[in-house]
Amino acid sequence: MIRPLLAALAMMTTLDSALAQAIPDAATQEVLIKTTLMSFNDANVTGNYAVFHARLAKPFRDQFSPEKLKTTFKTFAEKEVDIGFVVAKAPIPDAEVKIDDNGTLRIDGHFDTQPSQIAYTLKFIRSDGDWKAVGIDVNIGKPPAKDAPPPAAAKPPASAESGKIQFGK
């Protein structure tokens, strides 16, 4: 009697792990992208990184204080960069969305904006029951030429402003 129960419990645990690692659908990805970038933008525009910090994954929050975030992204604040308008734009993927062996969801993309393009790499883990950011890399620069090949996920456009921070770095 105990053996079948243990087998059923093991299957449920495996199924639960598999479900937790499912790639979110396109609508959820867009919400993750936009909410992360808008929290990031609000922090840069106001100079208050407390709310942005609170929305990050716990391991990220433990490693990076709001003050460290402010220092890391000071270029955006100094140049008064405001990317709030991206909420009205559709994100364009630059690479296939994937979850690595550590359970980190990676989303690479950009927004078709002029005169500069906003490119991002966002990394999320499951934290407190939701996908929360553990890495953010935002680059604002000239978009690639129309006849140029699509940008590689690892190579952002020539940046006027950029900032990157990631858990464990």
PLM segments and residue spans:
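Short solvent-exposed beta->alpha transition segments
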Residues: 24-39, 50-104
